[in-house]
Structure formats: structure tokens, C-alpha cells
Amino acid sequence: MAAMAVALRGLGGRFRWRTQAVAGGVRGAARGAAAGQRDYDLLVVGGGSGGLACAKEAAQLGRKVAVVDYVEPSPQGTRWGLGGTCVNVGCIPKKLMHQAALLGGLIQDAPNYGWEVAQPVPHDWRKMAEAVQNHVKSLNWGHRVQLQDRKVKYFNIKASFVDEHTVCGVAKGGKEILLSADHIIIATGGRPRYPTHIEGALEYGITSDDIFWLKESPGKTLVVGASYVALECAGFLTGIGLDTTIMMRSIPLRGFDQQMSSMVIEHMASHGTRFLRGCAPSRVRRLPDGQLQVTWEDSTTGKEDTGTFDTVLWAIGRVPDTRSLNLEKAGVDTSPDTQKILVDSREATSVPHIYAIGDVVEGRPELTPIAIMAGRLLVQRLFGGSSDLMDYDNVPTTVFTPLEYGCVGLSEEEAVARHGQEHVEVYHAHYKPLEFTVAGRDASQCYVKMVCLREPPQLVLGLHFLGPNAGEVTQGFALGIKCGASYAQVMRTVGIHPTCSEEVVKLRISKRSGLDPTVTGCUG
């Protein structure tokens, strides 16, 4: 074993030293790296949205690039292609199934608009799933083609570090592959967490890794968790007509504005999703007829209860996909609590030439556009002469529940905690989308609020919108908030009529005033 002193920059900007033992006998990998004979300028570990963005950006800057990516099958055996969580088991299939559910609602509205629709209108899970899966596969292929066009070498191998410049993997034929690079970016993302302490959870439960690839309808489904993944999955399952229950132990949508979160739950409950609040499962068993019997405890009563379901979906959070990387061989530090990789503002790990982006990183929002932008900016700093850093403030996002919740900036709770109640002004309104009127839809939970500093010019701290097309509404206002918009500037913005978006530029009533925020009338 040869000893090598490696200078490591700490997260606080200080330097510290570590003596790292490197195995010089691993087929000369370490010796080759030390001799400046590395295979690539950049090696990206992980073929998700962030990793692919890094690879394509570096190739465009004329660098020699390789991507290694491998999908460990889920406990239920589900596997997929290149593209990561977003493409295969996240944003894309989720939004498409959300759209399927919205169409079901529009079919119910259609008779009020003069369409003669024979009822009931059945939903075909197999047809929807096949269409969604075919689209995802086309995206997998598209990513392969894009890498090939940019002369990025792609390796479908499970990589692990040999030393700080080298990774090792085994190809399908059993051949061992060693790859070295001057710079390495880790972008392996995360995977759903399984409650392994619960009897039967691993054997009989599925996660978001599986739901979008089911060939048959999941039937009566229990979704366990209060995350946005739990609510989104339960929302589209209810929307396509399935009997769906959410079991949550604590508050929903932790980290989001809690007033908005409560309204999301109210809307889902009023539209058919059942909720078991303050409950935690303790056992899952398969019955002779194939159904799953779930046992849980109600924390409010202390009593045990049971129910039967066709499918149990765990949506209790995600864990970083770092377990098989052998990060200790490279000297990369991780959080002892979360196992996520620790980085500084430049996305650099404890090893100067190893970086990490996306969901695998401690303290970063787990959002696809974040990983993509952070990756591109990182590569531009490495190879393009840029000094621009990723700005993680005021990042917009949307929860695609049946009534969508879009937000950007601070929640009301965060604003009050940061600035004090006396320095925060909240403008709000209950509104009714025009499309809901003729259809006779309930708009009780259609709501918008803007969180501002109270002192002039009343800087906008956050915007929260609950209603149709919330993502489309929030995206435009996110630019204004990013640029430092004030409440007065928003109020001087002319709205587009008739739209839901215009409700944002009509917010005149503050919570402090105590006046009724319900919007009445139209065109005025």
C-alpha cells in the first residue's frame, strides 16, 4: 500500500490534511492516474438529469467525457433505462398519470358544457401504463442518442471507487472495467426508503420505483406517507377511479407552507381520497386470496386496527444512492445522519477534483431542474472559465396533486421565523376559476397568498398558489421574485383576463386586515 497526502478543503473554507492509502496493485489504476495517463477529462457517475446535463455540457466544451450508470432493480424487480428518477419513475410518468386523472374530471364536467357523454366512463390502466411506459422508453433512447452524438462514452455498469481518480465496474459479460478521470462528478440521485422494520414491508410493498411500471391496475391501494410523492400518487390513483387511502403518521408536506398543505388535504379528502391520520403500520401480510392485510396503530387512541388492500405503496422519503460507491476509497465525506455527500458552494466534496450534484447532496432541494442547472454551472466553472455559482434561493416548485400547489420563496411560517410576525404582511384571496362555474365545481380550496415584508417597498418573500395549472402560474412569477419584485410592482402588473394567474396581481386584502378575502364578481 502506498500512502499519499491529499489536501482537502473543508466546507468552512479551511484546509485540512488526510493521509489516504491507495492500493497501487489494482491493475495499475492508481499508478496510471498518478502518471497523468487518465482516460477522461470528466467522468460522470450517474445517468440522471443532472449527470447527463454535466456530460453534455462538458462535451460541448470539447472535453473527453464518460458517463457510468446502472439501475439496481427495485425489491419487486422493476428496472428501467437511462435518464434517472425524473424520466423513469418520477416527474415524467407522474405528470402523465396526473393528466390522465385530470381528464377524468373533465369528462365529468363535459355534460355541463353540452357534450353528451355516456356514463360511467371506465378507465383502462393497461392502456394508460403502456402509453406512459412507451414514452419513457423513447426518452431513454433519446438520451443514448444524444450522448452518442456528442461523443460521450456511456458505460452501463455499477461503478465503485478504487481511488480518488478511478472507478471500477463489471460489464454484462463479466468483464471488469476501470475508468480514470481528472475530474469526477457524482450524480447518483436517490431511491425510495423502505420501512424495513415493518414485517412484510419489503416482500409485499411497492414504491414510486414500481407504480408507474405496473402492467395491471394496483386496485385498492394504501399509500403510506405524507410526502409530496405520497399525495401525488394517491391523487392520480383516486382520480382514475381507484379506492385509495393515505396513512400518515405526522404532518403532510413537511417543509411546505402548512396552511396550503392543509388545503391540499382538504381538497383530496372531499374528492374521494381517504386519510388515516396519526397512524403507523406495523405489519403487512398476504392473505390466501392474494390481498394484503395491513395492521396499524392509531397514536390518538393507542388501539390497533387492520385493513385489506390490493397494493401497499411506501412513500416515506428517499435515501441517497451512495451505498455501493465505496466513497471512503476516494476520501469523500458524507453526512453521518443522512449519508448524503457534503459539498461546498462550488459543489466540491472533501476531495478537490470530485464533485457532487442533485439529490445525492446534503442540503440541496431534490428537484430535477436544480440538478440540471447546478451541473451545467459546475461544468462551465471547470472547463468554460466561468465563476458563476448555483443560487439555491427562491426555487419554484409544484406539487401535482389533483388541485395543484405551486410555490416559490418562503412559506408564511419561514417568513415569520426569519423576520418576525410584525414585519411580515400576507395578502391573500379565495377565488373561483371561470372553468369551475359552468361545471358547478367546488372551489373552496382555490386560494392564493403572497408573503411580503411589511416595510416599504414590501419585498415579495414568497408566493403560494393552489388551483388549476399551478405550475404554469408559478413559473412566471418566480422570475419576478428572483429579480427582487416588490408588492407594489406586482400590483402594477396588468393581468391577463380571464385567467387564474391574474388573481395574483389582484391581491389587495391582507390577513392582518381581517377582511373577507373571497373574490366576488368578475371583470372588476
From Swiss-Prot:
Gene Ontology biological process terms in this record: cell redox homeostasis; response to hyperoxia; response to oxygen radical; response to selenium ion; response to xenobiotic stimulus
Keyword Repeat applies: no
Crosslink site: Cysteinyl-selenocysteine (Cys-Sec): 522-523
Cofactor: FAD
Annotated InterPro entries: FAD/NAD-bd_sf, FAD/NAD-binding_dom, FAD/NAD-linked_Rdtase_dimer_sf, GSHR/TRXR-like, Pyr_nuc-diS_OxRdtase, Pyr_nucl-diS_OxRdtase_dimer, Pyr_OxRdtase_I_AS, Thioredoxin/glutathione_Rdtase
EC number: 1.8.1.9
Enzyme class: oxidoreductase
Key words, A-Z: Disease variant, Disulfide bond, FAD, Flavoprotein, Mitochondrion, NADP, Oxidoreductase, Redox-active center, Selenocysteine, Transit peptide
Subcellular location: Mitochondrion
PROSITE patterns (UniProt xref): PYRIDINE_REDOX_1
Substrates-to-products reaction catalysed: [thioredoxin]-dithiol + NADP(+) = [thioredoxin]-disulfide + NADPH + H(+)
Residues the record lists as N6-succinyllysine modifications: 175, 329
Residues that, per the record, bind FAD: 41-70
An MF annotation (GO) of this entry: thioredoxin-disulfide reductase (NADPH) activity
Residues annotated as catalytic: 497 (proton acceptor)
SUPFAM superfamilies: FAD/NAD(P)-binding domain (SSF51905), FAD/NAD-linked reductases, dimerisation (C-terminal) domain (SSF55424)
Pfam families noted in UniProt: Pyr_redox_2, Pyr_redox_dim
Assembly, per entry: Homodimer.
Pathology noted in the entry: Glucocorticoid deficiency 5: A form of glucocorticoid deficiency, a rare autosomal recessive disorder characterized by resistance to ACTH action on the adrenal cortex, adrenal insufficiency and an inability of the adrenal cortex to produce cortisol. It usually presents in the neonatal period or in early childhood with episodes of hypoglycemia and other symptoms related to cortisol deficiency, including failure to thrive, recurrent illnesses or infections, convulsions, and shock.
Role: Involved in the control of reactive oxygen species levels and the regulation of mitochondrial redox homeostasis. Maintains thioredoxin in a reduced state. May play a role in redox-regulated cell signaling.
Family: Belongs to the class-I pyridine nucleotide-disulfide oxidoreductase family.
UniProt cross-references to PANTHER family, sorted A to Z: GLUTATHIONE REDUCTASE (PTHR42737), THIOREDOXIN-DISULFIDE REDUCTASE (PTHR42737:SF7)
Note in the entry: The active site is a redox-active disulfide bond. The selenocysteine residue is essential for enzymatic activity.
Protein name (record): Thioredoxin reductase 2, mitochondrial
Native organism: Homo sapiens
Protein's gene: TXNRD2
